[in-house]
């Protein structure tokens, strides 16, 4: 159970577009389910409609029966497809994790694991998820997964490589905080809802929602370790050339002062609609504006 203080922090850091999109997704999902139920329930009444249609248009009864059966089978196929899509989304990430990930236990790094438990307490997560190191970075789509009621947290293995190269654990600290933020916000469940139903109607919705979730998680991580520290971690870990002391301030200043023309803004928007995560410059720019 989260305390009032924890709930206040979660509310403060959540992206303003996240709740409206989640509500819209739930409403659209409910409407979709109701429409399917109404269509399926109306199949039994099609026989009477078929008789009226036969009298008015003088169609062959066999043709009408065939059309009714086709409609019935089509509705059943739609229901089965939605169900299979839900099952696929539920088990896809779990399958990827079981095939590509390796467990990370307390004995490997007691200090990091102790901090991990401390962060879980700060987020109001009573039972810390088991840590997995994701070796397949391209499929690191969902950081929080559930397998047989066990919760897991997937961490990017390359983050350990960066931490080892820079001799600094800050990047791991941020990675853990960012991923725990996704769990604290229940992002996996909402993303599953959108991927199963809403994204079938509006394909770009999934990528937009994933980007919003990423911004929310960044904000929550920044709330705990500091905005400037997060910017530094981004620059040091993912944009090493921009992190060099003589370039850092210049780079941040360019991000703040960058002005896009109308055509450039349209091009950037269209590109972002196809991306599931924001670019690192976009994430840094969002943190700077906090």
Whereabouts are the PLM-identified features?
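Active-site scaffold of zinc-dependent metalloenzymes
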Residues: 141-168
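Post-HEXXH active-site segment of zinc metalloproteases
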Residues: 186-214
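C-terminal capping/extension segments of zinc metalloprotease domains
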Residues: 1-10, 229-232, 244-290
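Short helix/loop segments within enzyme catalytic domains
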Residues: 107-128, 203-260
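Hydrophobic or amphipathic, alpha-helical segments that drive membrane association/targeting
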Residues: 1-137, 203
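Active-site recognition of the HExxH zinc-binding catalytic motif
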Residues: 116, 170-187, 217-218
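Soluble periplasmic/extracytoplasmic beta-strand elements of cell-envelope proteins
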Residues: 132, 152-154, 175
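Catalytic Zn2+-binding segment of zinc metalloproteases
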Residues: 179-195, 226-229
